[in-house]
UniProtKB/Swiss-Prot annotation:
The coiled-coil domaim mediates heteromeic assembly. It is a multi-pass membrane protein. InterPro entries: CaM-bd_dom, CaM-bd_dom_sf, K_chnl_Ca-activ_SK, K_chnl_dom. It comes from Rattus norvegicus (Rat). PANTHER family: SMALL CONDUCTANCE CALCIUM-ACTIVATED POTASSIUM CHANNEL (PTHR10153). Homodimer. Heteromultimer with KCNN2 or KCNN1; this modulates plasma membrane expression and consequently the small conductance calcium-activated potassium channel activity. The complex is composed of 4 channel subunits each of which binds to a calmodulin subunit which regulates the channel activity through calcium-binding. Interacts with CALM1. This is Small conductance calcium-activated potassium channel protein 3.
Amino acid sequence: MDTSGHFHDSGVGDLDEDPKCPCPSSGDEQQQQQQPPPPSAPPAVPQQPPGPLLQPQPPQLQQQQQQQQQQQQQQQQQQQAPLHPLPQLAQLQSQLVHPGLLHSSPTAFRAPNSANSTAILHPSSRQGSQLNLNDHLLGHSPSSTATSGPGGGSRHRQASPLVHRRDSNPFTEIAMSSCKYSGGVMKPLSRLSASRRNLIEAEPEGQPLQLFSPSNPPEIIISSREDNHAHQTLLHHPNATHNHQHAGTTAGSTTFPKANKRKNQNIGYKLGHRRALFEKRKRLSDYALIFGMFGIVVMVIETELSWGLYSKDSMFSLALKCLISLSTIILLGLIIAYHTREVQLFVIDNGADDWRIAMTYERILYISLEMLVCAIHPIPGEYKFFWTARLAFSYTPSRAEADVDIILSIPMFLRLYLIARVMLLHSKLFTDASSRSIGALNKINFNTRFVMKTLMTICPGTVLLVFSISLWIIAAWTVRVCERYHDQQDVTSNFLGAMWLISITFLSIGYGDMVPHTYCGKGVCLLTGIMGAGCTALVVAVVARKLELTKAEKHVHNFMMDTQLTKRIKNAAANVLRETWLIYKHTKLLKKIDHAKVRKHQRKFLQAIHQLRGVKMEQRKLSDQANTLVDLSKMQNVMYDLITELNDRSEDLEKQIGSLESKLEHLTASFNSLPLLIADTLRQQQQQLLTAFVEARGISVAVGTSHAPPSDSPIGISSTSFPTPYTSSSSC
């Protein structure tokens, strides 16, 4: 990039600088790029930047210096001219040749060596430019590219004002511009989640490089920040621009944001949405229970008032029935909303894309049955039918005109199943994340049955009491309503009489003084008897559990019994020893033997032996009873501790053995190197000995040369001078 704000591709072998360019380069790089060709080269060949000269000849150096001086003079003349103002940019634009464009990232990359190739550069991709690009952008001048003459190879690039973006990171620009020389392809980063917490604006530097045809230059389209499905600058081909614009305003704004929003939800958003659905489902269940119980209470009030105070055709009855119908409609809406939340939770938990996957036949049947149960209620208006029954003791038929509300009112008690649902959703075991995690690891399904089991374990008496009293009251009122049209003596139609009938049926007593007349009352008594048998069994189990000793009480009891049995064993053993001594005394030590006393002590001796055996047997039984599951678990813990200690000791032993092995290996290596050391030591001693002999021999030769005979040894040492086992070593 030169001082005029133009960009020169220096350092690339296929791009050359044109000496006729109106925008000269500056510095040493321009001098190296614009060196003239050698004299032998023809003028039509494009100038190539010469490589580094190694040890040039003096004439060549002089020629290069002259050429450089001429180039510097030309550059100074060109630099004295003003820079390209905005009017001149418009003139330069008319002289441009429209070439094939390369759709690139904001960083420049290597362009091919052709006269019709340019590249669009982002204004922030070259930060070292001296041209005021901001003024260029404010002037709204179109992007222009300048090419040299037919013989030139340089490409002067100007920034395009069509792209508007924030200032880029210089370190990012350096890393991206290195791809021009290293051949790397700039790929976009992976799209992050589109949730509200981690929405980030995508950078246009991450767009991949795409090559377009010379006849169809790219068109730059800038997306707004309000676009939910783009978030980044898109470069479209002009042939497909109209299709993208037309489709983006219609289908893109409706379908694409929803799909991307669903796909780009991260785990945190899903967990938060799941927790919100849990809370909404719990509130819907609470509201459904409230409206269901409200309808039951209003139904009971309307039934009792229409029997004694006013008739079914009165305004009070109509108002109460309308209130029941309104509560029923609200209840049905709440149930639909509840199951909608259930389906949404299923979709989130299983990662499904379509909610229809959750709508199995079983779920549809369950929802339909629940809607049918909750939809039953007395219809506003007066509707009657003839009810025929046979009396219990006289067996005479009885015919009466009854209200249809009896058939529609009694099934409303089936709405009480909502209590179990509310108990499940409000249970600590169901709402606590830790308990649910532990249950999932142990393959436990948290449902209503599990919650009822835990309640029966924690407070069995309270659960049975509440269940029995509720069943007693509901069954008594149902029998009273069923029997009121055929009870001429007012026995079972009385509420207290009905409670007595239900109580004796519940306890499976059945005195027979009161019996139902209608099939409705008989059916209620049958269900009451079945539920009473189950409740009685549960009561017996609860009482037996309450009478059972706890673990601490069992341990204390076993300890006390063991202590008493130990004392009895000691007493029985002492009695055996005492009777043995007395028998020995009366038979051996006394002069006159008293046979009566001997038989008496023998009898006591046998009794003491049997007593000792019996106490030992009781002690064995107590020890067997003490070996319960708790003791076995304790023994298991003790054995586990012992095994752990043994493992620790074995690990220590292995470490010691390993250290011994390493030491043995070291000793083995030392022993293996010992012969070499001994050989080296002996060799050194032999050399020292030979040196001493040579020195001694030299001294003796110097003293008596004429007296010593000539030596045949190659080193001039006589064999007699070496010590032998049979000679003296005084010469040493």
